[in-house]
Amino acid sequence: RIHIEKIIGSGESGEVCYGRLQVPGQRDVPVAIKALKAGYTERQRQDFLREAAIMGQFDHPNIIRLEGVVTRGRLAMIVTEYMENGSLDAFLRTHDGQFTILQLVGMLKGVGAGMRYLSDLGYIHRDLAARNILVDGRLVCKVSDFGLSRALEDDPEAAYTTAGGKIPIRWTAPEAIAFRTFSSASDVWSFGVVMWEVLAYGERPYWNMTNQDVISSVEEGYRLPAPMGCPRALHQLMLDCWHKDRAQRPRFSHVVSVLEALVHSPESLRATATVSRCPAPAFARSCFDLRAGGNGNGDLTVGDWLDSIRMGRYRDHFAAGGYSSLGMVLHMNAQDVRALGITLMGHQKKILGSIQTMRSQLSCTQGPRRHL
C-alpha cells in the first residue's frame, strides 16, 4: 500500500507527492509519488509509463531508484525513492556558499558516475541539468527525470535524431540544437553546464540572455566564464566538455577519472581560474550593459543591477553604505562588500564576481563610455 502525505511539487505532467510505501512485515519506506494529471491523453500515459520502464532497468547508487508503478483504472503513478534535499539547483541556492570545493566536486563525481553508467548502457539522457538531479540527506546526488531519455544502438558513435519537442537550450550542445542530433557527447556538454551550475550555486546559466542570444554567443565561441572562486582545473574540464567538435569532448569515463583525481589531490584545486576574456557580441548585447542602461532607456541604477543578479535583498545595504551609482560600485573590493553587512560568503562571491564582469565589459566595449 501507498500512503500519500503531502504534495511536494508539480509539473506539466502532474503532481509529485511525498508518501510512505507500506510493505507487509517491513518498515515503511519514504517515497516520492509522481502522479499523472487527470484528463491525460493516451500518448501522455504511454510516455509516462515509458519513463518508468526506462528507470526500472537501472541499478546504480547515482541513479534514482524506481520502487514501483501503479496503474489501476485511470490512475497512473510512478513511485521512486524519496530524496530529502530535493533538486540540486534549488538545494544549492538555499545553501549558497556553504560547501567546500571538495564537497562540490564530490557531488559532481556522483553525477558523473551516474552518467557514465547510463552511457555504458547505451542511454542518452537529453535533459541533464541541475534541476533534474536529486540530493539525499547525505549529499549523494542522483540523476532523475528520464522523460526524454532514449536508447542508442550498440555503435559507440551512434546518435539519436528527433524531429520535434522542446529543447532546453542553455544545457544543450550546439549540434543537438541545430540538427536535433543527440549522443553521449551531447550529454557531456550538458554535464559541463551542470558543473558550472554547481560551482555557481544554482545560478541560471547565461543569466538573463535570451535563448537566441545563447545560441548565437556559443556559435561565436563564447563559453561560460568560471564562477567566482572556481578552481582552474574544474573550469578547464567544463571547457573540454564544451568543445564545439563533439568527437573532441571527453567521455564520461574520463570525466569521472579527472574528478576522482582532483578529490585525491586537493592541492590541484587551489589555483583559481582567471577572469574570462571579453564577452561575445551577442552576450554583450544581452548582458546588463553598462553603456546602454539596465532597463534599456539609459537609467542605470544599483537596484537594477542587484535585481539582475538576484541580490535585490541588499538594495538597502548598498543605499545605507552610500553606493548611489554603479560607478561607485565598480571600485568596491571584498572588504567593502563585507562592510555593508553582507555576511554570506556565497553572496559576497556573487556580488564581487558580477563587479568583476562589469569591469571586464567596460574594458572590452568599444566606443565612448557613458557617465555612471
Curated annotation (Swiss-Prot):
It comes from Rattus norvegicus. This is Ephrin type-A receptor 8. InterPro entries: Ephrin_rcpt_TKs, Kinase-like_dom_sf, Prot_kinase_dom, Protein_kinase_ATP_BS, SAM, SAM/pointed_sf, Ser-Thr/Tyr_kinase_cat_dom, Tyr_kinase_AS. The keyword Transferase applies. Keywords: ATP-binding, Cell adhesion, Cell membrane, Cell projection, Developmental protein, Endosome, Kinase, Membrane, Neurogenesis, Nucleotide-binding, Phosphoprotein, Receptor, Transferase, Tyrosine-protein kinase, Ubl conjugation. It is a single-pass type I membrane protein. Gene3D superfamilies: Phosphorylase Kinase, domain 1, Transcription Factor, Ets-1, Transferase(Phosphotransferase) domain 1. Most abundant in brain. The gene is Epha8. Phosphorylated. Phosphorylation is stimulated upon binding of its ligands including EFNA2, EFNA3 and EFNA5. Autophosphorylation on Tyr-206 modulates tyrosine kinase activity.
